[in-house]
Amino acid sequence: MRQKHYLEAAAWKLQDSCPGQARYLLWAYSSSHDDKSTFEGTCPYCCQLLVQDKSRVRLKPKPKLTPKIQKLLNREARNYTLSFKEAKILKKYKDSKSVLLITCKTCNRTVKHHGKSRSFLSALKSNPTTPTSKLSLKTPERKTPSSANLNHTSGSKGKSPALIFRTPTSGQSTSICSSKNASKTKKHFSQLKMLLSQSESKKNPKMDFRNFLSSL
């Protein structure tokens, strides 16, 4: 497998500088193996790389929907009985495939690549292989402090009773957090009040008896 990829990469590198050497590398690998179509994008007959200048590509489409076939489809949908000839025409229409024709300009041989039939595509549309539930992305679960405390207590069941007794419950943890937040806000408020009083004292000095006499 590694040798195959190495030879294919070397052939694509040599297709402009030495196309004969590129064809020889592909032919040497294909001749030593039973499967002739081992390389994609190459001619299975002469091992020529099917690039734009050395190949011709055509598409043979599926047969179009005619009024006769549409009438047969409507009769089949209504569960009407069809004759052998009509059923054969309808089966041929459903099993029809698009064909990609690639002609190699070196050996003038054509390679056919068949597509999927109408019946397969209709079945694929009606019964998708990948359900929509798998395609939906899962939202990550957010852990709250209460859930973390519950997980901690559940994980500490196998420990000693002293450790289990010391683990606070969710209500106690919330009350402790609220008391800590209240003390922090009171401390910040007192500091702000002290700063404001200092600034006011700097702007308005104390009116003692000496200042009062000097103002007169």
Curated annotation (Swiss-Prot):
The modification Phosphothreonine is found at residues 130, 139. Pfam families: DUF4674. Residues 124-136, 145-157, 167-182 have a biased composition (Polar residues). Keywords: Phosphoprotein. The modification Phosphoserine is found at residue 126. Disulfide bonds: none annotated. Residues 118-185, 197-216 are annotated as: Disordered. Residues 200-209 have a biased composition (Basic and acidic residues). InterPro entries: DUF4674 (IPR029779). Belongs to the UPF0711 family. This is UPF0711 protein C18orf21 homolog. It comes from Bos taurus (Bovine).
